[in-house]
C-alpha cells in the first residue's frame, strides 16, 4: 500500500445487481490491499456486509482521503454536493448511461483504480453554484448544484415573466418557460439540450440559457463566475420553483427573489492519467473522428 490514500470511502445508491456486484468487488479488493475502507450505510445494508465500518456521506467526507462513487452521473451529483464540503478527492465508476463525471470503466475499474491509488491521476476543481430563495436579502431556503440551477413552473408548464440582474445591475427581462443557470460541469447536461454552449471545466464562467423564450432575440449568455445573479418575478402565478441538479426543489413564494452565486468550496474530482475531456466529449456526444 502506498501513502497517497489511506482511507477510502465507497459511495453510491445501487439500483440493479450489477452495481452491487461492483460495490462488493471494490470493497473486498481494497481490503486485500490493506486500505481502511468506509462503506456508505445503504450499500453495507444491501450487501449484508458484516464487521464493516460504515458512515454517512458527511462522515466519509470527514474521515476518508478518497471517495469512489459507483453509479451514473446522477449518483455522482447527489454524493458530490455533500462531499465537496470536505477535503476529499472523488472519482467515479460508471454504472449509468453517459458517465461524464464517472469515467472509470466498470469492466476495467480495478486496474484503472490501482493506477490512481499509486498516485497516477489528474486532479481538477469543479465549482458549485449556491442558490438562495430569499425575501429582502433575508436568507430563507438554500441549496447547491454542481450542474445547474433551473427556474421553472412547479406543476403545469406555462410562460414565466421575470427579470435578471447581474451584480445588482439590470441585465434583461424575459418571458419564457424558464431559465437554466449552469456551471461548466453542467454545460454538457440540461443546458446543452436547451441549446447552451459547452464550456471546458477550467473556465470560471456561468451560462444563462433561456428555455423556450417568447422572442427570437433571446440567446444564451456567458458571464464571469464571480458574478451574483438575482431573479425577480411579476408573481402573477405562485407555483414557481428552482431545482438544483434536478434532484432538489425549492418553491418560490410571492415577494421572494432568487440569488445564485458561486460556492465558496469546490469538488475535488480526479481522473485516470490518460483522461482527456475532449475525448470524453467525442465519445459521449458521437462527434466525428480524426480525418488524418
From Swiss-Prot:
GO terms for cellular component: cytosol. GO terms for molecular function: ATP binding; metal ion binding; NAD binding; NAD+ kinase activity. InterPro entries: ATP-NAD_kinase_N, ATP-NAD_kinase_PpnK-typ_C, NAD/diacylglycerol_kinase_sf, NADK. The keyword Chloroplast does not apply. Its EC number is 2.7.1.23. The record marks 175 as: Responsible for conferring strict specificity to NAD. Keywords: ATP-binding, Cytoplasm, Kinase, NAD, NADP, Nucleotide-binding, Transferase. Competitively and allosterically inhibited by NADH and NADPH at physiological concentrations, whereas inhibition by NADP is only slight. Inhibited by p-chloromercuribenzoate and HgCl(2). Optimum temperature is 60 degrees Celsius and half of the activity is lost on treatment at 65 degrees Celsius for 10 minutes. The active site is at residue 73. NAD(+) binds at residues 73-74, 147-148, 158, 175, 177, 185, 188-193, 247. The keyword Kinase applies. It catalyses: NAD(+) + ATP = ADP + NADP(+) + H(+). Optimum pH is between 7.2 and 7.5. GO terms for biological process: NAD metabolic process; NADP biosynthetic process. It is an enzyme of class 2 (transferase). It is found in: Cytoplasm. Its cofactor is a divalent metal cation. Belongs to the NAD kinase family. Involved in the regulation of the intracellular balance of NAD and NADP, and is a key enzyme in the biosynthesis of NADP. Catalyzes specifically the phosphorylation on 2'-hydroxyl of the adenosine moiety of NAD to yield NADP. It can use ATP and other nucleoside triphosphates (UTP, CTP, GTP, dATP, TTP) as phosphoryl donors, while nucleoside mono- or diphosphates and poly(P) cannot. Homohexamer. HAMAP family: NAD_kinase. This is NAD kinase. It comes from Escherichia coli (strain K12). The gene is nadK.
Amino acid at each position: 500500500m502506498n501513502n497517497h490514500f489511506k482511507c477510502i470511502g465507497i459511495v453510491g445508491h445501487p439500483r440493479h445487481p450489477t452495481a452491487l456486484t461492483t460495490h462488493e468487488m471494490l470493497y473486498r479488493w481494497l481490503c486485500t490491499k490493506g486500505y481502511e475502507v468506509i462503506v456508505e450505510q445503504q450499500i453495507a445494508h444491501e450487501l449484508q456486509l458484516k464487521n464493516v465500518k460504515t458512515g454517512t456521506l458527511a462522515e466519509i467526507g470527514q474521515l476518508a482521503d478518497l471517495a469512489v462513487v459507483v453509479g451514473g452521473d446522477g449518483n455522482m451529483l447527489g454524493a458530490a454536493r455533500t462531499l465537496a464540503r470536505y477535503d476529499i478527492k472523488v472519482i467515479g465508476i460508471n454504472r449509468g448511461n453517459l458517465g461524464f463525471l464517472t469515467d472509470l470503466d466498470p469492466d476495467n475499474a480495478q486496474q484503472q483504480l490501482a493506477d490512481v491509488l499509486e498516485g497516477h491521476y489528474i486532479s481538477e476543481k469543479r465549482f458549485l453554484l449556491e442558490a438562495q430563495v430569499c425575501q429582502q436579502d433575508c436568507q430563507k431556503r438554500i441549496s447547491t448544484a454542481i450542474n445547474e440551477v433551473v427556474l421553472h413552473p412547479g406543476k403545469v408548464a406555462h410562460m414565466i415573466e421575470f427579470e435578471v440582474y447581474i451584480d445588482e445591475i439590470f441585465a434583461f427581462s424575459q418571458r419564457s418557460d424558464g431559465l437554466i443557470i449552469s456551471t461548466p460541469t453542467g454545460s454538457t447536461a440540461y443546458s446543452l439540450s436547451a441549446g447552451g454552449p459547452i464550456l471546458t471545466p477550467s473556465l470560471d464562467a456561468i451560462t444563462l440559457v433561456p428555455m423556450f423564450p417568447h422572442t427570437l432575440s433571446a440567446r444564451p449568455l456567458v458571464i464571469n463566475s464571480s458574478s451574483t445573479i438575482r431573479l425577480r418575478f411579476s408573481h402573477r402565478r405562485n407555483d414557481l420553483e428552482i431545482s438544483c441538479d434536478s434532484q432538489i426543489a425549492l418553491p418560490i413564494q410571492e415577494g421572494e427573489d432568487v440569488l445564485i452565486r458561486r460556492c465558496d468550496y469546490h469538488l475535488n474530482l480526479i481522473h485516470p492519467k490518460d483522461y482527456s475531456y475532449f475525448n470524453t466529449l467525442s465519445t459521449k456526444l458521437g462527434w466525428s473522428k480524426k480525418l488524418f
